[in-house]
């Protein structure tokens, strides 16, 4: 009987990348992808993925409240629950899939040495949480770790990660690119990806809404919300003339891969820029990053964080 590997996923992107990791052969011949229960976006993404031809040996399990006792693949390496599972189960081999810009921070911490606690960029941990992050970092040093990513990684960082004993495997959504396109695309020429920067208190709401309003005054806009956008903000966006909000709840990589030549995607700093370029550039669709003007940032956005976000795109201002 073939032993089944488990992948624990907590976001739509993690779920998609777990499928890609299985397709790439990183998880063995049989994989069960287990979504965390209670998240509508995961339920919708699971439904959309099951409508496609999944790789052989892969099962998209029903959502569960609890993480499996042993997990081969995860997305959120900074999760306290994930780190506790690593410490209590001795996983041996770990595959970490993309989880947005947090993946880049993880690579930077792994490259910096074994005594850097695995903590989120804006975390203010207490002593116990810092100790858990440090213990998790040391556990990874004793395990075989693979980071599976579609994000751009500099040669310098990639070399440092590999010197630290971590395998870095790049991918270009090979499984998804091979799937037939059946989703209906928006009629609008311009598609805007929503952002979590406003809800996270990093970008001023008024400035962001003014930009959307000005953009929609020039042409109709299709707006695809970020899964963590504030419902109050979305209600305000829906009120703007010329903006159609498509509340899909699935990764942009799935929803927008069928855009037509001549359409374009605009986005504030987001890892979706990289993945959508992989999927859409061959179709003649422009994916245009939008630089965040200085007066958009709030005082909570420290200069280092602004640089970290902006360094992942070289763009135009809408």
Spans of model-derived segments:
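Short hydrophobic beta-strand segments
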Residues: 1-10, 32-36, 69-75, 146-149, ...
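Histidine-anchored nucleotide/phosphate-binding helix
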Residues: 12-27, 87, 204-216, 272-278
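Donor nucleotide-activated moiety binding/catalytic core segment of transferases
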Residues: 230-274
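Leloir-type glycosyltransferase catalytic cores
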Residues: 299-318
């Amino acid at each position: 009987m073939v032993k089944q590997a488990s992948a624990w996923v907590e976001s739509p992107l993690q779920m998609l990348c777990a499928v890609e990791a299985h397709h790439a052969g990183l998880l063995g011949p049989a994989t069960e992808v287990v979504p965390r229960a209670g998240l509508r976006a995961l339920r919708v993404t699971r439904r959309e993925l099951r409508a496609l031809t999944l790789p052989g040996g892969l099962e998209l399990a029903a959502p569960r409240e609890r993480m499996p006792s042993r997990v081969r693949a995860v997305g959120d390496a900074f999760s306290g629950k994930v780190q506790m599972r690593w410490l209590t189960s001795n996983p041996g081999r770990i595959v970490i899939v993309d989880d947005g810009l947090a993946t880049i921070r993880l690579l930077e911490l792994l490259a910096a040495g074994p005594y850097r606690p695995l903590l989120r960029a804006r975390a203010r941990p207490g002593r116990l949480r810092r100790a858990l992050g440090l213990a998790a970092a040391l556990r990874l040093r004793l395990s075989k770790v693979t980071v599976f990513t579609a994000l751009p990684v500099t040669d310098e960082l990639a070399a440092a990660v590999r010197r630290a004993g971590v395998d870095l495997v790049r991918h270009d959504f090979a499984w998804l690119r091979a799937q037939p396109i059946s989703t209906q695309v928006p009629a609008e020429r311009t598609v805007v990806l929503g952002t979590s920067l406003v809800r996270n208190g990093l970008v001023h709401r008024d400035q962001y809404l003014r930009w959307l309003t000005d953009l929609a005054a020039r042409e109709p806009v299709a707006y695809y919300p970020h899964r963590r956008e504030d419902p109050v903000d979305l209600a305000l966006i829906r009120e703007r003339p010329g903006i159609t909000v498509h509340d899909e709840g699935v990764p942009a990589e799935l929803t927008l891969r069928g855009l037509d030549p001549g359409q374009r995607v605009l986005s504030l700093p987001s890892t979706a820029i990289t993945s959508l370029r992989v999927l859409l550039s061959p179709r003649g669709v422009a994916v245009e990053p939008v630089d965040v003007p200085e007066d958009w940032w709030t005082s909570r956005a420290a200069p280092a964080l602004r640089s970290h976000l902006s360094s992942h795109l070289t763009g135009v201002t809408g």
